[in-house]
Amino acid sequence: VTWLELADGVFARRHADLDLTLGLVLGTERCLLVDTGTDAGHGAEFAEAVRELTALPWSAVITHGHWDHHLGTSAFGPLPVWAHPAAAAEIAHGTAAQVAEWSAREPFRAERLARSPVVVPDREVLDRVGLDLGGRVVELRHLGPGHTPGDVVVRVPDAGVLFAGDLVEQGAPPAVGPDADVASWVGVLGRLGAADVVVPGHGNPVDRAFVEAQRAELAARR
């Protein structure tokens, strides 16, 4: 588990489990978590790591409704949690099935997942939301369906960093599941906007050239 400082006050936290990458953006008044981890225990570890960097009040954005990105939320206590409505609905109504599937697939996870309360996001990202963290405005954007119907990306314009969730994966091909819309996904990757550093939901941070190559790979799969 390691912190990567991508720019002033912008961090990615890399985890060996599932090659997961979480994010943290600091302002002068509050901080933003980008996803919260795979389960309550993982979330608690993430919360402790964040508190080693900052005591600022936190809010979270969930990039999409898959369990490995949001089941850590309960560890942070009451806090504002942003997501697209489709992701919030998936979290509310689909997490039990996801947990059952992964507990059967990887039984070592079953107990930890069973002890992880589901926290449904309470703030909506329909198109664009600007969050003022104090001295820095972060943009939450829904650019259309892709990896899931409710993907949200997080742009930190002053730092040239974009958190892409599972719209981008490094170290493995993009995960095209039954809830993916590949044709729309290709278009979404073309609309990410300028960013020097793109942080995938799994894997190490990449550049725009990597994103373009992955976009071409997806286009070939349509």
Give residue ranges: language-model regions.
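A short catalytic or substrate-binding loop motif that flags glycine-/basic-rich loops and adjacent residues
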Residues: H15-D17, E124, G144-P149
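Metallo-beta-lactamase
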Residues: E5, C31-L32, T36-A40, A89-R215
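Short amphipathic alpha-helical segments
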Residues: E45-A47, T73-A75, G94-T95, V176, ...
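Divalent metal-coordination and catalytic microenvironments
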Residues: G9, V25, D35, V50, ...
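Active-site metal-binding motif and surrounding structural segment of the metallo-beta-lactamase
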Residues: T28, A40-A86, A194-D196
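Conserved beta-strand hairpin/beta-sheet module of binuclear metal-dependent hydrolase folds
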Residues: W3-A49, V152-D166
